[in-house]
Amino acid sequence: MNIGIIVFPGSNCDRDVRWATEGCLGVPTSFLWHETTDLDGFDAIVIPGGFSYGDYLRCGAIARFAPVLNSLISFVDKGGKVLGICNGFQILTELGLLQGALTRNKNLHFICDRANLSIESTKSTWMKNYKKHDSISLPIAHGEGRYQCSSDVLKKLQDDDSVALRYADNPNGSIHDIAGITNKKGNVLGMMPHPERACDDALGDIDGKSILSTLLS
């Protein structure tokens, strides 16, 4: 198993993810600069949090044109696993690999806190270590984490069992309390909470470990 972490100018959670995957789980992990186009040899790709290109225009709007993301589309089509965390989730929606959009938080402020979450679907390969309706708590840190979509898209997400996580106490105004979604095939997961910040036993917080430990099987 080999993991690639895509790094953009402005990414700042790439090393956190590497510590979680390689330091805590022992999975070989490499950084992939946004200009690369070669994803051969990787079993899963993570797009980490941060402020790609300074979040100018809107979150992920510039990053979605990076050369590596053209290769990512082919990677997904072939069944490759992709996880987008926070800014990574925003990029996946801009790229069209996930539906909907992430907009300014309802209170118009940056939120740095913990969020109680409910597991709504285990369809995604990333979620298979949970059971439906499990309760977990993960850190959140975002200014534009309010998930929005049309009524048609919402119905499709629900019909396809693609709502992966919901907030127990919605912190940002996301429609239907949505904190994370998956694509129809289940190999792409986008989520605003940060599982990589809840993987280290030394911190006494490992609720996110079950997501990343799917890389071990």
From Swiss-Prot:
Pathway: Purine metabolism; IMP biosynthesis via de novo pathway; 5-amino-1-(5-phospho-D-ribosyl)imidazole from N(2)-formyl-N(1)-(5-phospho-D-ribosyl)glycinamide: step 1/2. InterPro entries: Class_I_gatase-like, PRibForGlyAmidine_synth_PurQ. Pfam families: GATase_5. GO terms for molecular function: ATP binding; glutaminase activity; phosphoribosylformylglycinamidine synthase activity. It is found in: Cytoplasm. SUPFAM superfamilies: Class I glutamine amidotransferase-like. Its main location: cytoplasm. Its EC number is 6.3.5.3, 3.5.1.2. It comes from the Bacteria. Keywords: ATP-binding, Cytoplasm, Glutamine amidotransferase, Hydrolase, Ligase, Nucleotide-binding, Purine biosynthesis. The active site is at C86 (nucleophile), H194, E196. GO terms for cellular component: cytoplasm. Residues 2-217 form the Glutamine amidotransferase type-1 domain. One of its GO terms (biological process) is 'de novo' IMP biosynthetic process. The keyword RNA-binding does not apply. PROSITE patterns: GATASE_TYPE_1 (PS51273). It catalyses: N(2)-formyl-N(1)-(5-phospho-beta-D-ribosyl)glycinamide + L-glutamine + ATP + H2O = 2-formamido-N(1)-(5-O-phospho-beta-D-ribosyl)acetamidine + L-glutamate + ADP + phosphate + H(+); L-glutamine + H2O = L-glutamate + NH4(+). Part of the FGAM synthase complex composed of 1 PurL, 1 PurQ and 2 PurS subunits. Part of the phosphoribosylformylglycinamidine synthase complex involved in the purines biosynthetic pathway. Catalyzes the ATP-dependent conversion of formylglycinamide ribonucleotide (FGAR) and glutamine to yield formylglycinamidine ribonucleotide (FGAM) and glutamate. The FGAM synthase complex is composed of three subunits. PurQ produces an ammonia molecule by converting glutamine to glutamate. PurL transfers the ammonia molecule to FGAR to form FGAM in an ATP-dependent manner. This is Phosphoribosylformylglycinamidine synthase subunit PurQ. The gene is purQ.
